[in-house]
Amino acid sequence: MSRKLIFATGMLSCFSCETLSSPEIREDLVKNHSTIAMEEYLRTSVQKTPLEILATFLLELKIKRETAVKLFSSYNAFLALLDDVEKRERLKKLSLEDIPTDVVFGEVRAISRVFQEGLTALFFHDDAKLRELTIFYGVF
């Protein structure tokens, strides 16, 4: 899930130029073909943690509460699972044959599904502009 979070927030950081940057920055880019302001904006943006970037988008774009809950509660559950030494050790020792029936792996899978549902809602359902950007730049 951490890789998905990093990938998703990388996309969001790029999309933030269009969705969250000031009109002046976007105008400077279009009218003057100057990327200086946009570069500075991105430089500041990428200094945030992935969870901060995600939270900013959820708040600024007024994404549905249900989506935010799915994303943050599932990620919190994932971190809690990783913090559980017994479960982490069990997953490390898990054989390929045991994956389909392992209770802890099933727990990870369930948490991951909820996180994926949140990402799908965020990128494709809750905000029209974000959906357009995802289809144009994120789906080849």
Regions found by a protein language model. Give the residues of each.
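Conserved nucleotidyltransferase catalytic core and NTase-mimicking acidic/glycine-rich helix/loop elements
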Residues: 1-140
